């Protein structure tokens, strides 16, 4: 595919996506704070995965990302009204934006859980083997621990989505020894060694990984 064709395709996808007020407000919040957020293609993929997997877990979906408002909006529209969405984010302003977005969609407040903390600090408290989907956009240095914790809470058949985790391919550069690159590199090695996870590495953002936990 040529670069011009690729750019045309992306424009077409964007043109076919008309954000409503809830999504537009969530995107505006992300832009105001300089937060990376999923584009239309990524958001639609997240919604599709959420729709496919939500019946698998009794505890719902975990969103661990600064852009929880944007991600949560895509996910919430794809799952049942009583599906719990747990947003984990240390910044209270981003949490409030996520809560506002989810409640604006008409979701019951009982289905929106906010955990104001670093994901790796609190995910160990979540119920094991009971979540249908875990979406994470975390620092590279935290990825190995995040993957370990996410694997523990996924229900069989559940999906782990790691956004922007391939660092535009720089993890293959042996001269990059900063903590985030080393952590991202270790995370990929961890995933490759898990024989009960089926992986797809996708060129969305700076590199996405979708990992599905095998059914028992």
List each language-model region with its residue ranges.
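A short alpha-helical cap/connector motif
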Residues: 1-133, 138-159, 165-216
């Amino acid at each position: 595919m040529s670069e011009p064709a690729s750019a045309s395709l992306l424009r077409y996808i964007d043109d076919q996506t008309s954000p409503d007020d809830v999504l537009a407000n969530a995107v505006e919040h992300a832009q105001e704070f300089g937060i990376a957020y999923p584009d239309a293609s990524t958001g639609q993929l997240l919604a599709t995965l959420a729709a496919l997997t939500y019946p698998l877990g009794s505890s719902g979906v975990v969103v661990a990302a600064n852009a929880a408002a944007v991600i949560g909006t895509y996910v919430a529209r794809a799952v049942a009204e009583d599906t719990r969405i747990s947003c984990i984010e240390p910044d209270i302003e981003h949490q409030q934006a996520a809560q506002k977005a989810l409640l604006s969609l008409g979701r019951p407040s009982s289905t929106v859980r906010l955990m104001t903390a670093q994901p790796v600090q609190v995910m160990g408290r979540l119920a094991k083997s009971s979540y249908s989907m875990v979406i994470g956009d975390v620092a590279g240095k935290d990825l190995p621990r995040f993957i370990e914790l996410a694997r523990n809470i996924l229900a069989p058949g559940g999906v782990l989505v790691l956004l922007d985790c391939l660092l535009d391919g720089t993890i293959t550069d042996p001269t990059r020894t900063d903590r985030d690159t080393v952590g991202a590199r270790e995370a990929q090695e961890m995933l490759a060694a898990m024989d009960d996870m089926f992986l797809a590495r996708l060129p969305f953002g700076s590199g996405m990984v979708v990992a599905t936990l095998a059914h028992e």
